Amino acid sequence: MISRVTISTIYNCTLERAFKTPILCDVSKVHTGFGIMPKVTHCTEDENWGKPGFSKKVYAAKSLTQKGGFASVDHVIERVENKYWKFQVNEFQAWMLGFHKFEAEWETTEIEPNKILIRYSYALHSNQPLFYPLNWLFAKTFWKTYMKRVLENVRQMAYNNELYLYD
């Protein structure tokens, strides 16, 4: 089963800033934790991060659902400069309600200079039918709320011209 969530907002910054900030800046400032979601602490094996076909290992703080340490792997699937990212999260190290991968998209559309429409989507893939109702509920409630928090974290980072860590 695939549970889909899409949210959107407007950023008042450059197109480049709106496009690059969520993927190329410090992910620990993007994913700061919320409820059962632990804060991301750092990444390794990220020398080529930001380029299609490459990945990085993501580490998280200890939480109710995570023992702390290596948590998952992020993969860049597609990058269309200043328009679109597609990335995937998988190899979860803790049980994730039957989810086995998350696919995400970050789309930027320039409405006018310094007015950028952001469309942020997730497809949460689960493969344990017993949990499908819970998967759907999780996606439509908790995950959607979490995505809104990420959007706001990225907004503040973009407005503050956060340093890019990757190309």
PLM features: residue spans?
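Beta-strand residues in well-ordered beta-sheet regions across diverse protein folds
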Residues: 19, 88, 119-121
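Hydrophobic ligand-binding cavity/cleft-lining segments
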Residues: 1-51
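Hydrophobic/aromatic beta-strand elements that line small-molecule binding cavities or substrate pockets
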Residues: 7-9, 71-78, 102-110, 122
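A conserved amphipathic terminal alpha-helix motif
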Residues: 123-167
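Glycine-rich portal/gate segments that line the openings of hydrophobic small-molecule binding cavities
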Residues: 29, 41-97, 152-167
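Short, solvent-exposed aromatic-acidic interface loops
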Residues: 90-95, 121-127
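A short, structured loop/turn motif at beta-sheet edges
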Residues: 12-16, 77-84, 107-117, 162-163
